Amino acid sequence: MKTLLLSPVVVTIVCLDLGYTMTCCNQQSSQPKTTTNCAGNSCYKKTWSDHRGTIIERGCGCPQVKSGIKLECCHTNECNN
């Protein structure tokens, strides 16, 4: 009888994604799109210019940046493309 009572609980746990992850883009500048799974709930896109031109860095989280660097943080899958 205990086995029958535990079966729905096990099925529920297996079907739910208890460790939610986000998918963030992580390609640099104009490279082909690549993604990574992130444990947090945000993605970022940093943009700045130097002697090479406009540089774009993408990844997980929402880091602190120096002045002169544009930072966009977002909270949906692949929102930083």
Curated annotation (Swiss-Prot):
It comes from the Eukaryota. Keywords: Acetylcholine receptor inhibiting toxin, Disulfide bond, Ion channel impairing toxin, Neurotoxin, Postsynaptic neurotoxin, Secreted, Signal, Toxin. It is found in: Secreted. Disulfide bonds join 24-43, 38-60, 62-73, 74-79. SUPFAM superfamilies: Snake toxin-like. GO terms for cellular component: extracellular region. Residues 1-21 form the signal peptide. CDD domains: TFP_snake_toxin. The keyword Phosphoprotein does not apply. Pfam families: Toxin_cobra-type. InterPro entries: Snake_3FTx (IPR003571), Snake_toxin-like_sf (IPR045860), Snake_toxin_con_site (IPR018354), Toxin_cobra-type (IPR054131). Expressed by the venom gland. Its main location: secreted. GO terms for molecular function: acetylcholine receptor inhibitor activity; ion channel regulator activity; toxin activity. Binds to muscle nicotinic acetylcholine receptor (nAChR) and inhibit acetylcholine from binding to the receptor, thereby impairing neuromuscular transmission. Belongs to the three-finger toxin family. Short-chain subfamily. Type I alpha-neurotoxin sub-subfamily. This is Short neurotoxin 1.
